[in-house]
Amino acid sequence: MAVYVKFEISQELEEKTAEVVANAEKIKKGANEVTKAVEKGIAKLVVIAQDVQPEEIVAHIPVICDEKGIAYSYSSTKEALGKAAGLEVPTSAIAVVAEGSADELKDLVEKLNGLKA
């Protein structure tokens, strides 16, 4: 497990996260864009790939999410995360800026916050 992975998520929760990302109206992709979205406080949910090398690229993201009170989750691979976001290329991180279904997102955030407690 990578150093920046603070908790493990089930396959079911990973699939639910991918669904929320796929249904999102607007996303930011890549570690730099995600960092900016979190720092500005516009991110509703952040998803980080677990296979990023070197790990330092995304290691700061869970820390700033905790500081800003933004929920975050993990994807098993960069490829899976890119595919969920509708991209043809892998991506290290995604920030959902405008959700597709607010209820879906709220339910997922509650489950993720329960894992961190």
From Swiss-Prot:
PANTHER family: RIBOSOMAL PROTEIN L7AE FAMILY MEMBER (PTHR23105). This is Large ribosomal subunit protein eL8. It is an enzyme of class 3 (hydrolase). It comes from Methanococcus maripaludis (strain DSM 14266 / JCM 13030 / NBRC 101832 / S2 / LL). The lineage of its organism: Archaea, Methanobacteriati, Methanobacteriota, Methanomada group, Methanococci. GO terms for biological process: translation; tRNA 5'-leader removal. The keyword Disulfide bond does not apply. The gene is rpl7ae. InterPro entries: eL8/uL1-like, Ribosomal_eL30-like_sf, Ribosomal_eL8/eL30/eS12/Gad45, Ribosomal_eL8/Nhp2, Ribosomal_eL8_arc. Transmembrane segments: none annotated. The keyword Manganese does not apply.
